[in-house]
Regions:
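Signature of uroporphyrinogen-III synthase
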Residues: 1-234
Length: 234
């Protein structure tokens, strides 16, 4: 029986990952447990000294907003390569950390040099990360946390856990929905879980999953390579 990789992360990342794995002759089941719903979030009138973007979803929504037009020359920080590539189509002064996670952003010189009272926009989702937000608040800047979207649960059907080789998860919220689905289906949490960060790995283990692997990146290419290597070693 050929088992499939269940890609539970949201679009468009799910489709991009599915294409890469399919190109390597890996069977996939593209069943996102979340959809992304934009939020009508008002942008500040005050122009920022720095814009920090924590996801590709936030980058796409922000890039299409009229508020972004005044920020063309302002420095932008992206959480990783994929988010940076979205921003750079409109904002050439965009950087990202070598360590593509919250800790990497925090370690950047641009974050360390933020002064008291400087205006910073933090672009994220409603269920976004709090680590960077806490660091910025402690630095005394004038922080605007802009929740541009929310992750909405999507019902999934037609999945037999016994026919799944592993599950690729993209967020804590997605991890929780995968856990609820699997518990409702024979109660098994033994299926291997592949996650992008240590934070989500810990969440998966706290939920009871017994085999969790951390890619250390949410980048589609990195995840694809990791999944391929994982399956070769099974």
């Amino acid at each position: 029986m050929t088992k499939k990789v269940w890609i539970s992360r949201s679009q468009p990342g799910a489709a991009a990952l599915a294409d890469k794995l399919a190109a390597s002759k890996i069977s996939v089941l593209q069943k996102p447990v979340l959809t992304i719903s934009p939020i009508n979030c008002p942008y500040p009138r005050e122009l920022p000294k720095l814009v920090i973007c924590l996801s590709g979803h936030a980058a796409r929504i922000y890039r299409e907003s009229s508020a972004s037009l005044s920020n063309k020359t302002i420095k932008h920080i992206a959480i990783g390569r994929e988010t940076a590539s979205i921003l750079r189509s409109s904002f050439t002064n965009t950087i990202f950390p070598f360590d593509e996670r919250s800790e990497g952003v925090i370690g950047l010189r641009e974050i360390q040099e933020i002064s008291v009272g400087e205006i910073v926009w933090l672009l994220t989702g409603r269920q976004g990360r709090g680590v960077i937000e806490s660091v910025l608040e402690n630095r005394g800047c004038k922080l605007y946390r802009l929740a541009l979207y929310e992750q909405v649960r999507k019902e999934v059907k037609g999945i037999d856990p016994e026919k799944i080789s592993c599950v690729v998860v993209g967020s804590v919220v997605g991890m929780q929905y995968v856990e609820e689905f699997l518990k409702g289906f024979k109660g098994t949490l033994s299926v291997p879980i592949i996650v992008p960060s240590l934070r989500i790995k810990k969440e998966a283990e706290n939920l009871g999953f017994t085999e969790v692997y951390n890619v250390g990146s949410a980048n589609v290419s990195d995840v694809s390579i990791f999944v391929e290597d994982f399956l070769v070693g099974r």
